[in-house]
A protein has these predicted regions:
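Residue register of alpha-helical TPR repeats
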Residues: 35-36, 76, 116, 155-157, ...
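Hydrophobic positions within repeat-based interaction scaffolds
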Residues: 31-35, 51, 263, 273, ...
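Amphipathic alpha-helical segments of tetratricopeptide repeats
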Residues: 58-65, 99-106, 140-146, 180-190, ...
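Structural signature of alpha-solenoid helical repeat junctions
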Residues: 70-73, 113, 153-154, 194, ...
Length: 341
């Protein structure tokens, strides 16, 4: 018996260095994957779900913090984590991460970090449907970035956010000017991932005018074709969601001219809703359900719309959303006070 125990102890001691080596080598591989996600502008893929992205980021960021506090990737990885929290429905954690980003960047007066922190604040406002404040935060982020360079390569990412916020506010002429700026930038600095999401914004702009003329919807179809072309070359699961979601919006708009398209839109929304129903707090599930409710409403399907509305907007959710807005307001107020000092 003692001999067996001794053998086990020897084996255990021998395994410790090997286990340490495995842990040490695994972290760089995970970090490389997260950095690859940054380049692709995705939050998950077919093999790495959103929960893994969050878990890896939470473990890796404290390790790389010491030597990377003034590194762009360090803050972009934090933004990626904040967006992953938001997508999963953990809004409070996303706000906490935005606060941490701002405090770290402010401590070292790192302007890129302050810019990205303001973007994270804007993203939190966006998910809380506070479009005015989201736009203000994105513009603050752009102002901070312009202190570094008005030609900074990250500028186009903020322009995409600003365009989206302007469209949500109904300021379509301003959004169109931003989209033109984005298009010019992409001609000089081609990037397939940014091009994919730029086509989403251009498609959304055309779809928002679809009730005026079918010509706008023809434009939207061209942008969807561009998205599909990129997706076929780079078949990311993250892109697939956005392609289907934007296509459903196109079908919904086409339904104003031919109601048969509403059935196509509902089919796509239902397909996406079933895929993401495992977490009904996720941003994707809520977006899809909101669009489905609207589509039921314009089709006169009041009961179906009401049932989904009750599921999505419970009293607890409303009170929680108000709490989120207060959290974000406090964080943005801190930035505004710092600007006055």
């Amino acid at each position: 018996m003692r001999k067996d125990v001794a053998v086990l102890m020897v084996l255990w001691v021998m395994c410790i260095p090997y286990a340490t080596f495995i842990c040490a080598s695994a972290t760089p591989n995970k970090l490389d994957t997260l950095k690859a996600f940054l380049r692709k502008k995705i939050l998950y893929d077919e093999y790495v779900p959103i929960d893994s992205v969050i878990c890896w980021s939470e473990n890796i960021l404290p390790v790389i913090k010491t030597n990377n506090r003034n590194d762009e990737n360090y803050f972009l990885l934090q933004l990626q984590l904040a967006n992953a929290y938001t997508l999963r429905g953990d809004i409070s954690l996303a706000i906490d991460r935005a606060r941490l980003m701002y405090e770290e960047a402010k401590e070292t007066e790192y302007e890129f970090g302050i810019a990205v922190a303001n973007q994270a604040i804007g993203d939190a406002y966006t998910i809380a449907n506070q479009c005015d404040k989201a736009l203000d935060s994105y513009q603050d982020a752009l102002k901070e970035l312009n202190h570094l360079s008005q030609q900074h390569p990250y500028r186009i990412q903020l322009l995409l956010k600003i365009s989206n916020a302007l469209q949500r506010k109904g300021q379509l002429e301003k959004a169109q000017k931003i989209l033109h700026d984005i298009e010019q930038t992409l001609q000089k600095q081609p990037d397939y991932a940014t091009c994919f999401f730029a086509n989403i914004e251009k498609a959304n702009y055309a779809i928002s005018h679809g009730h005026l003329s079918k010509a706008y919807l023809k434009e939207a179809a061209a942008y969807l074709y561009n998205m599909d072309s990129i997706y076929r070359i780079h078949p990311e699961k993250f892109y697939c969601f956005h392609l289907k979601y934007t296509t459903a919006a196109y079908y919904r708009a086409m339904g104003n001219w031919n109601r048969m398209y509403w059935n196509k839109a509902l089919q796509l929304y239902e397909e996406l809703r079933q895929e993401y129903t495992v977490n009904k707090q996720s941003a994707y599930y809520r977006w899809i359900t909101q669009e489905t409710i609207y589509l039921y409403k314009i089709q006169g399907k009041s009961m179906a719309a009401c049932l989904l509305y009750q599921e999505l907007y419970s009293t607890v959710d409303t009170l929680t959303a108000e709490g989120y807005v207060r959290q974000i307001n406090i964080l943005r107020a801190k930035y505004q006070i710092d600007q006055m000092e």
